[in-house]
Amino acid sequence: MREYRIKDTLILACDHGYGNIKSCHSVFKASAEVSETAPIFSKDYVKFKDKYYVIGEGHKSFLADKIADDDYYILTLVAIAKELALRGLKEAKIHLAVGLPLKWVKTQRDSFKAYLLRNRYVNFEYREKEYLVEIAGCTEIGRAHV
């Protein structure tokens, strides 16, 4: 597996689409449904700050501003966990490379970056495995559909 690093920092790409979240090695539905209790039937969930988020089972309504709720933050954690799991890691220092639609790069770049960097150290569970991640930085890249 090819990896990109800046010194000891792993660079992870994540495209925050309205229908799907895409990383280098995974694609999943952009859906996170919050609950105060652990889900009974699904193992595809994130536990973060005493809340549970079931991933990929519903459909997220369109929001032009992706920072209007916590969903894209949680979905980013899922993308991180999936990439780390492929590498056999549970802890990592990472730099996010994220895609935003060209139409919104200029107006949302700074706010989306702050949204993703709001917690430098993030401790969460995904699929009943604990992860500890240091999000050292974030680069926003405009994306276009061909």
Q: Which sequence ranges carry the predicted segments?
A:
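Nucleotide/phosphate-binding catalytic cleft detector across ATP-hydrolyzing
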Residues: 1-143
